[in-house]
Each structure stands twice: as C-alpha cells, then as structure tokens.
Amino acid sequence: MSNSINPIVWQEDCVLLVDQTLLPLAYKVVEIKTYQAMAEAIRTMIVRGAPAIGVSAAYGLYLGAKEIQTTDRTIFLEKLEAIAATLRQTRPTAVNLFWAIDRVMATVQGATGNIPELQNLILNTAKAIHNEDLATCQAIGDQGLAVLPETPEKLTILTHCNAGGLATAGYGTALGVIRSAWRENRLGMVYADETRPRLQGSKLTTWECVQEGIPVTQICDNMAAHCMQQGRIDAVVVGADRITANGDAANKIGTYSLAIVAKAHNVPFFVAAPLSTVDFSLSDGKQIPIEERDPKEVYQIGDTRICPEGVQFYNPAFDVTPAHLITAIITEKGAVAPDQLIHLKG
C-alpha cells in the first residue's frame, strides 16, 4: 500500500507540516522555518503523535543549527544544546521527542568536521529518522497481522485517538496495523472513539480512513463498553507515547478505561508502537511524566463554553495502561507479551 498521508515534508530550507488542528474542516500546510516555530508547532499540536513529534524535533534542531553563526565547535555545540533544550520543553510525555533529539545530539558530538559539515550531518540524521519511521510503521503494520484474531474472517477493530499516518512519518502504528489488515482483506470495520477532549479520533482517525476508503464508524468514548457487550468489537488496537520496561503504556487519556473494558469482555487489547517509544530507563508506568494541558480543551468546544463559570477542571493528556491489561505490544521487530519486551531491546 502506498503512503498517501505525508504529515511532514522536508523542502530545501523548511519543513512543511499538515496543520492537524484544522482537520477535517480544512487542509492546510504550514511552513516551519525556525526552531522556535517548530517548538510552537509541537506545543500547540499542529504536529502531534509521538513518532511525528520526534521527526519534527530532529528537523527543528537543524533549523536552529543552520542559523548558528560561529566557526568555534564548542560554541556551536553549546548553542545547539540550548536549541535542544527548547524543543525538549514542548511536551513531556512522548519519549520519541527526547529519543530523536538525543540521537541527533549524540551523532553530532561524536563527529569531526567543520561547522557546515556538522550542520549537514544534523540534516542527514533528521532525514534518516524520518525515513526510518515510515519503514518502521509499515513493519509494525505487518507484524500486527500475525497476532490479530484469526476469526472472524473480517475483523471489527476499535481504536482510540489517532495513531495513524498523521501521528508518524506516515502509515501509522495502530492505524498501520489496521491498514495492513485492510490490505489483506481482513478488516470489516474500524470503530473510532471520538477521543475527548481534543477529538483526535473524530477529527483525524476518521479523516484518514475516509481518505483511503477504509470503512469507519465513529462512536463517543462512553459507547465502547456497550459495543463490546453487544459483541461488535473483535480487537482493540491503540498507539503509545511512552512504554516502560515492564510493558506499562502511556497513551491518550481514556486508553486505560478502554483496556479495563476490553479485559472485562475478553477482547484482545494491543498496543502498537516503535521500539523508539519504549523507555527502558523507566521500570514502570508510575515514573512516566503526564502532561496536563489547558483546561479550555475541556470546557470549550471550538469557541463555545459548554459549562458554567465557577467549575474547576483537570485535564491530563495521557493515562497509563498497566501491562497486565495488554495482550501484546506490536513493534517493528515483532509482537510480544509486555513482560517479554526486554528481549527486543537493542
């Protein structure tokens, strides 16, 4: 299957990003020419999804590096680290952000050459991360086919948030598995949770499915249990923003509830993510930093306030699904039980 969704494109001296805050009502591509603009694009979720954030941050490092005016290597690296620090501060939960920045920084720090050569090395490393992520997502999709239920012949798969081409370099993780199932004629229907409060399932996942003719049914988040009780769902496949060494997985808020419901109804629950999303330095999910976002996301829809003044709000962007609720974690190297994840390290 060709990759028809390209949320990130490198074009000579800038990065082109699909503005995901406008979908599905408008399709707009924005030019990102500075690292400050890239940091803002990540923070405001013009670009979102852990792998896509990582790719974007790598390009952001280059956008900053090419503006550094010095011939002194030490000064160059100091200024580059300051740029990296700005990018690291944008979103705390998605580990791919830190993984990509650390990879670029380690590559540059270990290299020789003059400043233009180091700048070019940063760009080439960012391009490599970009290309590798697309190949990785396609591999995740194919690995997922091996663990999906054998019956029925055509599956109904429920997914949460958006772990598709828009959240990666293309193709997607959870939606990558779904795309591969569609390609192999194993998919009957996708059920997409709307995913409050930002509605990425409603706005983004359904949009991706429509673009490729994949049958999709949107439901409200609180309808998932009913759908499972009625036997409508054969499997749940979600993405992840950070997975710990023991297999706990942080994903968009509401994923944990979905996993509990799936367990109660004996519906297999899969997490699809690249190995770069696994943070082996953390032993369990209690150590994952959980981003809290603007309460406006909860009390407003568009520009319309939907609750009275005087109410307090709590808006965590992610929750952590314990490993014991996860049937398997699907990576580019294979699908394994959460407690076997350590065997894929390295």
UniProtKB/Swiss-Prot annotation:
The gene is mtnA. InterPro entries: IF-2B-related, IF-M1Pi, IF_2B-like_C, Initiation_fac_2B_a/b/d, M1Pi_N, NagB/RpiA_transferase-like. It comes from Picosynechococcus sp. (strain ATCC 27264 / PCC 7002 / PR-6). This is Methylthioribose-1-phosphate isomerase. Keywords: Amino-acid biosynthesis, Isomerase, Methionine biosynthesis. HAMAP family: Salvage_MtnA (MF_01678). GO terms for biological process: L-methionine salvage from methylthioadenosine. Pathway: Amino-acid biosynthesis; L-methionine biosynthesis via salvage pathway; L-methionine from S-methyl-5-thio-alpha-D-ribose 1-phosphate: step 1/6. Its EC number is 5.3.1.23. Belongs to the eIF-2B alpha/beta/delta subunits family. MtnA subfamily. Substrate binds at R48, G49, A50, R91, Q200, N251, K252. Catalyzes the interconversion of methylthioribose-1-phosphate (MTR-1-P) into methylthioribulose-1-phosphate (MTRu-1-P). It is an enzyme of class 5 (isomerase).
